[in-house]
């Protein structure tokens, strides 16, 4: 059975472009896009900290995923919850303190390691890592959604 991921993106067009690049990286590593969060082995929340309403929505979604993660039975691996983006960068420790169900918090400059970290924590059941690195997330190529007539192209970061 293939490992499946689900990505939720909040905020700016930069996050949309980076989520598209994250999808490519995950698919290169053998992951498949889930049809719903309920069937995902890993859920990634690509977060924004610009507006309080975005943060409030993300806190709510973390509660939803905590509950969903607790519903998985022994027949299926537990869902892994990953938080990345500006909110992860700014509030990483608060996120893991408030929601111990979060398995991985990834700052803005370590996103290129998400696929390899998921390879480690999904099969082993290990979790609770925080990745920080002073490197830019590099896009291997730009990804446009199937059937889309446009794609976001980042021109700066931060």
Q: Positions of the model-derived regions?
A:
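Proteins enriched for Cys/Gly/acidic motifs involved in redox and nucleic-acid/cofactor modification
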Residues: 1-158
């Amino acid at each position: 059975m293939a490992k499946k991921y689900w990505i939720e993106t909040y905020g700016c067009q930069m996050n949309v472009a980076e989520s598209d690049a994250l999808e490519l990286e995950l698919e290169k590593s053998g992951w498949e896009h889930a049809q719903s969060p309920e069937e995902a082995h890993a859920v990634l929340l690509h977060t924004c900290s610009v507006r309080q309403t975005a943060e409030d929505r993300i806190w709510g979604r973390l509660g939803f995923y905590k509950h969903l993660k607790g519903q998985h039975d022994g027949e299926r691996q537990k869902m892994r919850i990953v938080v990345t983006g500006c909110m992860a960068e700014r509030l990483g420790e608060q996120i893991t303190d408030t929601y111990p169900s979060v398995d991985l918090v990834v700052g803005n400059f370590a996103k290129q390691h998400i696929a390899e970290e998921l390879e480690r924590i999904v099969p082993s059941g290990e979790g609770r890592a925080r990745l920080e690195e002073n490197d830019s997330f590099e896009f291997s190529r730009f990804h446009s959604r199937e059937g889309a007539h446009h794609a976001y192209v980042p021109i700066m970061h931060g």
